[in-house]
């Protein structure tokens, strides 16, 4: 099994974020779960990759050429795949993975998470999508998503596809036990 990690290229302001990324890397390696991620040496993504690799885990980095040229590629990886674009990066990361976890991060992290979650909503895959809610980082997003449901722009069944947990072990158990709901036709002509 391999899990794709979306996370910040920054460590954030609080040490708890990097500590959680490091713990996630250790736990994945110890559970023999491969890590697929954005291929950089910096931020939370670099911390998770370093930890997984230090514990003997499989780590696959996928990075676009323009980021290699900016010298942020993790050159210490055993498997670093260089692609031509961000689109190719996301497609390959998804292809190589059996599920997705987002740690705290910025726009790129959110964009990556929302894209794979949308693919699940549309029935393009049945892989679990999850948030590791470190230090309540995603509390505001969870509240907003509940508001989106209440306002009729997201079905509760699709909201429920997103796993949100505060603890690495609990999160991995939820991912392991995830059963994708049947995707029914969600667009009705009268609503378009």
Task: Indicate where each model-derived feature is located.
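Active-site/ligand-binding-proximal alpha/beta "capping" segment
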Residues: 88-122, 130, 182-187
């Amino acid at each position: 099994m391999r899990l794709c990690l979306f996370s910040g290229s920054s460590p954030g302001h609080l040490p708890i974020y990097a500590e959680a990324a490091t713990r996630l890397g250790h736990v994945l390696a110890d559970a023999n779960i491969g890590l697929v991620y954005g291929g950089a040496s910096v931020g939370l993504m670099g911390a998770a990759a370093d930890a997984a690799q230090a514990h003997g885990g499989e780590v696959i980095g996928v990075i676009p050429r323009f980021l290699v040229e900016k010298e942020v590629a993790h050159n210490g990886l055993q498997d670093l795949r260089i692609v031509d674009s961000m689109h190719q990066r996301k497609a390959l990361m998804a292809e190589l993975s059996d599920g997705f976890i987002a740690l705290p991060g910025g726009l790129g992290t959110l964009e990556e998470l929302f894209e794979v979650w949308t693919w699940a909503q549309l029935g393009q895959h049945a892989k679990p999508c999850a948030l590791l809610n470190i230090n309540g980082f995603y509390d505001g997003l969870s509240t907003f998503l509940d508001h989106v449901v209440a306002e009729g722009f997201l079905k509760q069944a699709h909201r429920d596809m997103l796993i949100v947990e505060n603890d690495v072990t609990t999160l991995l158990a939820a991912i392991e036990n995830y059963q994708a709901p049947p995707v029914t036709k969600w667009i009705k002509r009268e609503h378009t």
